[in-house]
Amino acid sequence: MTLLTQIPEWRALETHYRAIRDVHLRRLFAEDPGRGERMTAEAAGLFFDYSKNRVTDETLRLLMALAEARGLRARIDAMFRGERINITENRAVLHVALRAPRGAVILVDGVNVVPDVHAVLDRMAAFAEQVRSGAWSGFTGKPIRNIVNIGIGGSDLGPVMAYEALRSYSRRNLTLRFVSNIDGNDFAEATRDLDPAETLFIVASKTFTTLETMTNARTARAWLLAALGDDAAVARHFVAVSTNAAEVAKFGIDTANMFGFWDWVGGRYSMTSAIGLSTMIALGPDHFRDMLAGFHAMDEHFRTAPFDRNLPVIHGLLTVWYANFFGVETVAILPYDNYLKRFPAYLQQLTMESNGKSVTLSGEPVTYQTGPIYWGEPGTNGQHSFYQLIHQGTRLVLCDFIGFAETLNPLGAHHDLLMANMFAQAEALAFGKTTEEALAEGTPAWLAPHRTFPGNRPSNTFLAERLTPAVLGALVALYEHSVFTQGAIWDINSFDQWGVELGKVLAGRIAPELMSEVAPSPAHDSSTNALIRRYRAWRGRAL
């Protein structure tokens, strides 16, 4: 593929950027009174207002032309056809199959995978109902009241986010906890107040060899056996989400209680697979299927909608526009709903593990910026924290506001005040306050520079009627496909993650040097060697 920066469509955008880079949003809105209603799109229960972006109709036309030139439509079709678009691992990328309806046909190597997907979903539903109803009891006969999901990365971030987002729909007599970090403090605090006889562990690891997950799983087994004293208890208090039946059985888990998934499901795209078992237990199968339906609605919108009305495509192209032309390095995710407090962390993995790449699909170094940094905090907490920098700092930050017309917990004027703040922040970022306006308000001349807001800070706003399982599914799918769009433009592989491997290898070498009773002779750089010696000295081990 021709280098991105050499194609005519990219050159046209460079020329266009130079023409409009200093145009203020105040001017764009003044010259086009209908802009706020025209630059919107809607699908799958989500309303998308992108009018507060530093773009014109010509910008959007040029971005759409770029998408066509980079073969975005063909790449979308290839993913949905089950082609092996993850070329470095020779795998299909078919998280969309996980939420396809029962009668759909999606082929991988000529085999329809949808029946197998629904077979796993049906097994998950049956097990979830057993736990929720109390029919599944622990080793002592007590019903299960506590669910602890042990995983890391995609086996943790998705389930945590979905549970927190949809907690209002959950079975409140069940306690859900999540353990991911190999730091023992994580496990200790998650289980401190739990009764082992009433606790079920879900161990989520495709290979059942993941260091962090299996370290925590072995600790969980020891914790359980210390209380119940019989190895047979493991089979009543542990289930697995894995494809390694031999390791699952060796651990003591009945393989009848092993829920599998496929190598065409990437970890950060896996929350709608068996990785979502804890979510299904918490919400119930019906709400889980509602969430899948929301995912599927956005999948179909992404697959079929024209690019100029396609929410993920527009969102992804705008991200490219800011990253590559304005030099924007970060995107702030600002959900004005406390149930979405873990959504920014979830998107960090989805976006940064996907598009944090520096070589093209053909292995050539890129000559342009790729994935930006994602971060955020629920409103209005962030307003009293980092919004100062977004409003008056020297860095341009792209903001995504997410809000809902109805709250799940009506309490007086709380929700109206919350949403007033969201709308106000987007308005303030876009239009700011001039020095003249500050002076007209009576601000002393010496103070006016400090009370001037430059504005022209871009933002997107997503609005839905209320946060439901279906809306959450649509929202997550939108970001998944926005990431895909960005990766297609940049010609990178959004579906591998080789960057996490080197640290794992080095940790495997260093761990014995930390734990050895005999002083090792570490062969690292002088800094790492000194840190190892300091650590061993403070741990009271031989030097």
Swiss-Prot record:
Pathway: Carbohydrate biosynthesis; gluconeogenesis; Carbohydrate degradation; glycolysis; D-glyceraldehyde 3-phosphate and glycerone phosphate from D-glucose: step 2/4
UniProt EC number: 5.3.1.9
Pfam families, alphabetized: PGI
Active site as annotated: 353 (proton donor), 384, 504
Keyword NAD set for record: no
SUPFAM superfamilies named among the record's database cross-references: SIS domain
Catalytic activity: alpha-D-glucose 6-phosphate = beta-D-fructose 6-phosphate
Location(s), subcellular: Cytoplasm
Major location (coarse): cytoplasm
Functional note: Catalyzes the reversible isomerization of glucose-6-phosphate to fructose-6-phosphate.
Name used for this protein in its record: Glucose-6-phosphate isomerase
Species for this entry: Roseiflexus castenholzii (strain DSM 13941 / HLO8)
Lineage, opening ranks: Bacteria, Bacillati, Chloroflexota, Chloroflexia, Chloroflexales
Record gene name: pgi
